[in-house]
């Protein structure tokens, strides 16, 4: 069972870029592994580092700024997670420590993969995201409160409403991935299997 997501308060880092694709999130040369851990070290590798091996941090990239170390909420622009459908993208984000991504829109496959990996993608309007970028710029180190149960983001003096469909919300709040959903019906599955003829088992 995955970790439950009900509420999260975290430091916000502003990635002021639209159309951030999955190859930028986790470059293809790091996709050999099939476990979900270890990808955070290579998150935004080509932007975070000046060398291919990831040894020399790029001082001009926002994730490397001292005031954003330990950030767990990523603020981005429209069409976040576009490109190929690699599930490694949310793996890299969560392994780095992100719990929430806020943007005006997400690529459909990335959006679905995020829920499967307990990464909450929050859609707000362009105008609301503009407000949040301005707020973070004026208040480096600001924390947002994200409440999945109430479907609200509290930022400064304002509260922003977002909508997550009921099924995905239920899964995240109960820490259920695809396997967890199946295991909810473990007794019913076992009962069904016991009723099958021996040659079908």
From Swiss-Prot:
Record Gene3D superfamilies: Aconitase, domain 4
Q: Which SUPFAM superfamilies match?
A: LeuD/IlvD-like (SSF52016)
- Per the record's keyword annotation, is Ribonucleoprotein included, yes or no? no
Give the organism the record lists.
Escherichia coli O6:H1 (strain CFT073 / ATCC 700928 / UPEC)
Question: Which family is it part of?
Answer: Belongs to the LeuD family. LeuD type 1 subfamily.
GO molecular-function terms, A-Z: 3-isopropylmalate dehydratase activity
**What CDD domains does this protein map onto?**
IPMI_Swivel (cd01577)
Q: What is the official name of this protein in its record? A: 3-isopropylmalate dehydratase small subunit
The biological pathway it contributes to is:
Amino-acid biosynthesis; L-leucine biosynthesis; L-leucine from 3-methyl-2-oxobutanoate: step 2/4
Q: What is this protein's function? A: Catalyzes the isomerization between 2-isopropylmalate and 3-isopropylmalate, via the formation of 2-isopropylmaleate.
Give the GO biological process terms. Answer: L-leucine biosynthetic process
Question: What reaction is this protein's catalytic activity?
Answer: (2R,3S)-3-isopropylmalate = (2S)-2-isopropylmalate
């Amino acid at each position: 069972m995955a970790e439950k997501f009900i509420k999260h308060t975290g430091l916000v880092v502003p990635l002021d870029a639209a159309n951030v694709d999955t190859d930028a999130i986790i470059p293809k040369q790091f996709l050999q592994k099939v476990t979900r851990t270890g990808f955070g070290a290579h998150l935004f590798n080509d932007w975070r580092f000046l060398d291919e091996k990831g040894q020399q941090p790029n001082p001009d990239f926002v994730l490397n700024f001292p005031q954003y170390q330990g950030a767990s909420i990523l603020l981005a622009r429209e069409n976040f997670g576009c490109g190929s459908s690699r599930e490694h993208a949310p793996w890299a984000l969560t392994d780095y420590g992100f719990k929430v991504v806020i943007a005006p829109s997400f690529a459909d496959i990335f959006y679905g993969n995020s829920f499967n990996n307990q990464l909450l993608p929050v859609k707000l309007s362009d105008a609301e995201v503009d407000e949040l970028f301005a707020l973070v710029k004026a208040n480096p180190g600001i924390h947002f409160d994200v409440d999945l149960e109430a479907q609200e983001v509290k930022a400064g003096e304002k509260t922003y409403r977002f909508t997550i469909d009921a099924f995905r919300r239920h899964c995240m709040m109960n820490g259920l991935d695809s396997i967890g959903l199946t295991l909810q019906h473990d007794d019913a599955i076992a009962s069904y299997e016991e009723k099958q003829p021996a040659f079908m088992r």
